Amino acid sequence: MDIDLDRARALRVLGRGAMGTVFLVADGSRPDRYALKVFDKRSATVKPDADRRARWEMSVLSRLAHPHLPSLLGFTETDDLLAWAVPYCSGGDLNELRYSLPDRVFSPAAIRFYVAEVVSAVAELHAAGVVYRDLKPENVLLRADGHVVLTDFDLSRLLHHRPTSSAASSPSPPPPAAYRAHHHHHHNRRERVPARSDSAIAGRPPQHWSSAAPSPRQKLQNLVRFLMGSDGGAGGMAKKTKSARVSPVSRKPGSFESSGGGAWGKSYSFVGTEEYVAPEMVRGEGHGFAVDWWAVGVLVHEMAFGRTPFKGANRKETFRNVLHRELEFPGDSRRRMPELTDLIERLLDRDQRTRLGNAGGADEVRAHPFFSGVAWEMLTEVSRPPYIPPPADEGLVVDGEAFDVRDHFRNLHGQPTPTTKATGSDASSSSDFSSEF
């Protein structure tokens, strides 16, 4: 679907980041509100790779059809703006939810529920040849029904080799999902490591992503490919807001290589959120899909114990801990939660060759005893979420509160705006917050 900016009325700003601004939008042509990500091309002078990253994210989104992954609803492009729409999620994210809990930790049962859905989403990405590289609680969003959706794919990368595991857990089409631009708590802001270019990748989607039938989705994908240009892919990426570039001595030239012996393609770029970065990425020895399973291990640890396992006083110390500090659990956690702690230990194996999920992919992770009893084929059908978000405010927007997203950017650049504005009529008003996405 093409986004008509003449009809799209922004209700509020959901987030701001290195790639642009996210708006909650009501559109008379659609019954549901959606999130509109808008990249201002005029900012490319200070963020030269943000445009390519934005187009890469659109390319990935256009190929997703899974209950725990967002889909591209549509996009539009003007001389100054590139905008794309995704379903809106009103339930916040796992980081917000954890901080709302009395002890700021999840129960093993809640961890099992949420992480099973995350594993399902990661499995789908890996089956499509995409390594995510940005898993963290802030990027695990809650739909209105309490199920989760991953977000932010600008740091993802296409690898040449697919994992051997089967695809994701649910073959059913995605239910009406919601999207919400995530934001960070000021007291728990995490920094992303800026991307380093993989200069040799062509970046084209794998063949199995293509469909012979010219469906509406395929037509949308063709348009995205046209926007991406002949090379596709994300190429080199600019750093995220408040991120500092880190270049370990062992860094190798950016490239994709097949490491032989049945191994998957490797990337030598250096991206992610520092507390979630895998050791092979810090060492610069090349990484593949296994970095996502390491991140799942960090996620489980943070959900269970309220902190990531290797966080240091600064980035240098954090990376040193990732490489060398022994994994520890508080108190008698190993006795009380043997399956949970064993899952974490196997996911946080510093040797990516023996890490859980590396050899057998998602099937190996799903077979771990911690997930015993999980109905993988029916996650959204038979599992009741531990937390159901309260209904979103559906109050009417009063005259003058809805606005044209183009006016937002005209004002930023000191340009005159039209004197007459249409107003929205079917969404709530709320104060803005800032974030990186």
PLM segments and residue spans:
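Protein kinase glycine-rich loop
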Residues: 10-18, 22
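Conserved N-lobe beta3->alphaC-helix segment of eukaryotic protein kinase catalytic domains
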Residues: 38-64
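Glycine-rich ATP phosphate-binding loop
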Residues: 19-43
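C-terminal regulatory tails of eukaryotic serine/threonine kinases
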Residues: 167-250, 358-437
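Activation segment signature within eukaryotic-like protein kinase domains
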Residues: 114-115
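A conserved loop-to-beta-strand element in the N-lobe of protein kinase catalytic cores
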Residues: 70, 79-87, 91, 95-96
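A short, aromatic-enriched beta-strand patch in the conserved N-lobe beta-sheet
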Residues: 74-75
